[in-house]
């Protein structure tokens, strides 16, 4: 390594020019969107752009078992200087790439394994985890990929060392249930800050997540805060709700029937719906090698198209699932951007309803009426285009083939969750979910076994909550109880054996963590903790709360959802 004290200015300038030239040359093969790292002083650059060929070489060398490790590494000095050093040294005899990385970067520390005190109940274990999972960005380094936030926040756990958008809502449910309303308020404030900073909420607070968002749960977060602070929370966050809506609807005013623009689509009949989209079409920095391998496995498709669809699936939160693929056994057939997801549009319906309510709270009746009209139009579009009449369930719309898709997934419960479903259709969805998705350990994500983590036999805490509350909204209490009871039993049995909660569960039985996907099973785990606490308080009466799952199934759920039903349910 060249000592810093002998880096004379002329030599450094020459090296930097060479480094930048190498960066641009390397990334021309991935996407025309790659840019000079110094060209944008406003938006922080992700590590694949900041470090160019060095990042590519480190990831391709597979120096670390998890590709996210180097994506999260912090440069110890100006990345341009590190890149200049690298280009000057890499072809020298005896050059050691791992040593170079160790000298020039601070790698993320492996989190200390949390060992709970002996004899803790499930509730006690979760309550003890909140401080363990709480993080702050007060000391973020200059070139860190971590994006600073003004308040502390709760992370999922494991390899996920940052805040994630849709995860956080389900974590916040548990924080509220534990009485940590201060943490709930802090996390809502953080997301409001991100909307003000970027115009939207990124996938997570990392530079490499800035090109996409995630399922839009901010409206639900604000509605949760209303339970503690009243309508003042609606008025406080109305500007941020409006900005997030503008992000999702950007470009709608110029669309003609049959056209799409980023996240918004206009169908042939003029109906406006949304899809997931990532602004970049390169490999994901946190899964670099895997994405390149996926693209290479299907040379008949442009690599950039595959990269965009992989990234857009990450934006959906369902990364990955047969839901997005033509061939469930071949990830390279993914085409997320040609699919209109039923869950996304249900969530945007909720955002429109919350905007109407917030506008009314702020005294703007005209705006409230406008948002109500937008919500009603979306609800009609959901009923018209996202209902599979032949199968009897809500499903995604296929833009490529101009028809409704047949696959039943747990996303079919989202219209029930936001009270956007007609009563007769809600009953059909409940019957379908009970017949095809309900398993001994909870609700399966799909009925397809693809080896991907958002497929059978995995069940995920947020989807259990959405299903249980959605079913309750429409009086399907028995099915809601079965989902709740079976999933809680699964969580309890796993905790009894392993003394931890995990990211996902195998619902084909009880007591087993889930598998599949790009990385090992993670424990912690934010949204599992939050949903478990909420469900514990659903199955046990308020006057006699339970700290662990009872050994026998209760006769009924003790609480009901607090959301006001929309006109669709009347």
UniProtKB/Swiss-Prot annotation:
Low complexity bias locations: 554-570
Region named Disordered: 544-570
Q: Where is the active site?
A: 319, 503
Enzyme Commission number(s) = 3.2.1.28
Q: Where does substrate bind?
A: 159, 166-167, 203, 212-214, 284-286, 317, 518
Q: Where is the signal peptide?
A: 1-34
Q: What class of enzyme is it?
A: hydrolase
Q: Which Gene3D superfamilies match?
A: 1.50.10.10
Sorted UniProt keywords: Glycosidase, Hydrolase, Periplasm, Signal
Q: Name one GO cellular component term.
A: periplasmic space
Top-level lineage group: Bacteria
Localization per record = Periplasm
Chief place where the protein resides: periplasm
Under the heading SUPFAM superfamilies, the entry gives: Six-hairpin glycosidases
* Keyword Hydrolase carried by entry: yes
Q: What does this protein do?
A: Provides the cells with the ability to utilize trehalose at high osmolarity by splitting it into glucose molecules that can subsequently be taken up by the phosphotransferase-mediated uptake system.
Q: How would you summarize the oligomeric state and partners of this protein? A: Monomer.
Q: What is this protein called?
A: Putative periplasmic trehalase
Q: Which organism is it from?
A: Salmonella typhi
The organism's lineage is: Bacteria, Pseudomonadati, Pseudomonadota, Gammaproteobacteria, Enterobacterales
């Amino acid at each position: 390594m060249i000592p810093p004290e002998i880096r004379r200015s002329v030599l450094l300038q020459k090296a930097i020019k060479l480094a930048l030239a190498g960066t641009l040359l390397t990334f021309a093969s991935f996407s025309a969107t790659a840019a000079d790292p110094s060209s944008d002083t406003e938006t922080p650059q992700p590590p694949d752009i900041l470090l160019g060929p060095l990042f590519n070489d480190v990831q391709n060398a597979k120096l670390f078992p998890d590709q996210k490790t180097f994506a999260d590494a912090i440069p110890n000095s100006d990345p341009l200087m590190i890149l200049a050093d690298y280009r000057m040294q890499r072809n020298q005899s005896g050059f050691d790439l791992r040593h170079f990385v160790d000298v020039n970067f601070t790698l993320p520390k492996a989190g200390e394994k949390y060992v709970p005190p002996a004899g803790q109940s499930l509730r006690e274990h979760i309550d003890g985890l909140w401080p363990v999972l709480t993080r702050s960005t007060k000391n973020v380094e200059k070139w860190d990929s971590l994006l600073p936030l003004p308040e502390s926040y709760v992370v999922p756990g494991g390899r996920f060392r940052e805040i994630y958008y849709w995860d956080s809502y389900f974590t916040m449910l548990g924080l509220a249930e534990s009485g940590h309303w201060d943490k709930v308020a802090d996390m809502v404030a953080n997301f409001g800050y991100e909307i003000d900073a970027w115009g939207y909420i990124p996938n997570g607070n990392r530079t490499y997540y800035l090109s996409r968002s995630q399922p839009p749960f901010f409206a639900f977060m604000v509605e949760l805060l209303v339970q503690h602070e009243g309508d003042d929370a609606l008025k406080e966050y109305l500007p941020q709700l409006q900005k997030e809506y503008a992000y999702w609807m950007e470009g709608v005013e110029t669309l003609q029937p049959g056209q799409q623009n980023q996240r918004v689509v206009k169908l042939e009949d003029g109906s406006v719906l949304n899809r997931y989209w990532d602004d970049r079409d390169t490999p994901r920095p946190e899964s670099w090698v895997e994405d390149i391998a996926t693209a290479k496995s299907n040379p008949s498709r442009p690599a950039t198209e595959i990269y965009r669809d992989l990234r857009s699936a990450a934006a959906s939160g369902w990364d990955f699932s047969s839901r997005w693929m033509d061939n469930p056994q071949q990830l390279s057939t993914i085409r997320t951007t040609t699919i209109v997801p039923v869950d996304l549009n249900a969530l945007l319906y909720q955002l429109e309803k919350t905007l109407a309510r917030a506008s009314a709270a702020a005294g703007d009746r005209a705006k409230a009426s406008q948002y109500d009209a937008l919500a009603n139009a979306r609800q009609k579009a959901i009923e018209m285009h996202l209902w599979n009449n032949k199968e009897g369930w809500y499903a995604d719309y296929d833009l490529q083939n101009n028809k409704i898709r047949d696959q039943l997934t747990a996303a079919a419960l989202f219209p029930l969750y936001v009270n956007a479903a007609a009563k007769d259709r809600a009953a059909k969805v409940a019957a379908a979910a009970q017949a095809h998705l309900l398993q001994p350990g909870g609700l399966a994500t799909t009925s397809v076994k693809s080896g991907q983590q958002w497929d059978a036999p995995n069940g995920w805490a947020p989807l259990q909550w959405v299903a249980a509350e959605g079913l309750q909204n429409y009086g399907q209490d028995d099915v809601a109880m079965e989902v709740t009871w079976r999933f809680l039993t699964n969580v309890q049995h796993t905790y009894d054996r392993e003394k931890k909660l995990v990211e996902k569960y195998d619902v084909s039985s009880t007591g087993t963590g889930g598998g599949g996907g790009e990385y090992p099973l993670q424990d912690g785990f934010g949204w599992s903790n939050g949903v478990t606490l909420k469900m514990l308080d659903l199955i046990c009466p308020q006057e006699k709360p339970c700290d662990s799952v009872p050994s026998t199934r209760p006769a009924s759920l003790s609480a009901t959802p607090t959301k006001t039903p929309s006109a669709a349910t009347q």
